[in-house]
Amino acid sequence: MEWSREIYTFYINFEVVSLVPPSFEVLPDPQVIFTVENLGVILASFLLISAVAHFVIAFVRNKNYNENLKKGMNPYRWYEYAFSSSIMIVLIAQFLGIWDLWSLVMIFVLNATMIMFGYLMEKINQYPKKTDWSPYLLGCISGFTPWIVMAAYFIAALGSGETEPPTFVYLILLIYFIMFNTFSINMILQYKGINKWKDYLYGERVYIILSLIAKTALAWLVFIRIFASF
């Protein structure tokens, strides 16, 4: 697929203006570190991570998986999401115009941290009668931050008189903000024990379906964007 993004660093340089009196300027110095290409490989990566995780759960760690389900937890889910969803959100960030290397690193880490708070939520709430929502709330903070940053870039693009974000950008921002939050809603329904979510296994099935939809939808949206240019 013909697609590429140059990834920058924005370190600063100090330029001496005069020695007497001492004076200098601080100037940003954007440098291209590398170019992200091979979009097909990136799209395949999070799908492959998910496939490998499901293979391991089904054939290698199935006994542990079933034992954990009885305790109301699935750590393997969170391990997989920490990588696959973080790759997804970094890719989305690049489509929205975030090309600074360290901003992308922070987005990846913040998203992965949010996911591991989900793991912690299940781990510490296996047995208590009263649910401890601290990991959930902390996860919301770390997980919501990248979306604030991406929304800021999107709004800045809207405010520019020279450019207009393509329809694809509107779609991907809206669809994936909704998709990412459905995972959070699923967790709330599980721990509140609402209707069918009283059964932990029902929530587990919902996670599997949501994961499949999110990954497949992103892959197709990107494919359509590249070939149809909408």
Task: Please provide the spans of the model-predicted regions.
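Polytopic alpha-helical membrane-helix bundles and their juxtamembrane interface segments
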Residues: 1-74, 85-230
